[in-house]
Amino acid sequence: MGTSSARPAVLALAGLALLLLLCLGPGDVSGNKLKKMLQKREGPVPSKTNVAVSEHTAKEFLGGLKRAKRQLWDRTRPEVQQWYQQFLYMGFDEAKFEDDVNYWLNRNQNGHDYYGDYYQRHYDEDAAIGPRSREGFRHGASVNYDDY
C-alpha cells in the first residue's frame, strides 16, 4: 500500500526534474533558452536617439509640404487634348465646352447650386408615402414643378 501511494509522487518528482532539465539545460546550439528570455527582459533600456533637427523645425518643414491638387482639365496633358479634340469633333463648339468645363469645375464652390445637394431630391413624388418633411417639397403632383 505504501508503494502505490509513493508511485504518483515519484512520477510527479521525475516529471518536475525533466521539466527543469529541459528549461534550464542547454537547448540547441544557441544555448540556454530560459536564460536568454530572462536576459531579453532585463535588457538595457534604449536611450533617446539624438537627432540633428529639433522637433519644431521638423514639423515646420513637414507642415509646408502640400500635395499639388490634381487638375483634371490640365491642357498640357495629352489625354486632355485628345478629349478636347473628340468634343470638338462631336459638334461641341469651343465656347460651350469651356462653359461646361467651368461649370463642372466650380460646381461645389458656390454654395447651393440648383442641382447641388439641396434642391434636387431623388424620390418618386407619386409614391404612397411622401417626403419626411411635409413643408420641404410638394408631394403628389405628377410633375416635379421644382425642376421647371
From Swiss-Prot:
Induction per UniProt is: Decreased expression in the choroid plexus after penetrating injury in the central nervous system.
Q: What role is this protein assigned?
A: Probable hormone that may attenuate cell proliferation and induce senescence of oligodendrocyte and neural precursor cells in the central nervous system. ECRG4-induced senescence is characterized by G1 arrest, RB1 dephosphorylation and accelerated CCND1 and CCND3 proteasomal degradation.
InterPro entries hit by this protein? Augurin
Superkingdom, taxonomy of origin: Eukaryota
Compartments (UniProt record): Secreted; Cytoplasm; Apical cell membrane
Annotated coiled-coil segments of the chain: none
Keywords, alphabetical: Cell membrane, Cleavage on pair of basic residues, Cytoplasm, Membrane, Secreted, Signal
Q: Which residues form the propeptide?
A: 32-68, 133-148
- Keyword Secreted listed? The answer is yes
The family note in this entry says: Belongs to the augurin family.
Protein name from the UniProt record: Augurin
UniProt-listed Pfam families: Augurin
Q: Which GO terms describe its biological process?
A: anaphase-promoting complex-dependent catabolic process; cellular senescence; central nervous system development; G1 to G0 transition; regulation of cell population proliferation
Please give the tissue specificity annotation from the record for this chain. Answer: Expressed in the brain, with expression in the choroid plexus and the ventricular ependymal cells (at protein level).
> Where is it mostly found?
secreted
Signal peptide limits: 1-31
GO cellular component terms attached to this protein's record: apical plasma membrane; dense core granule; extracellular space
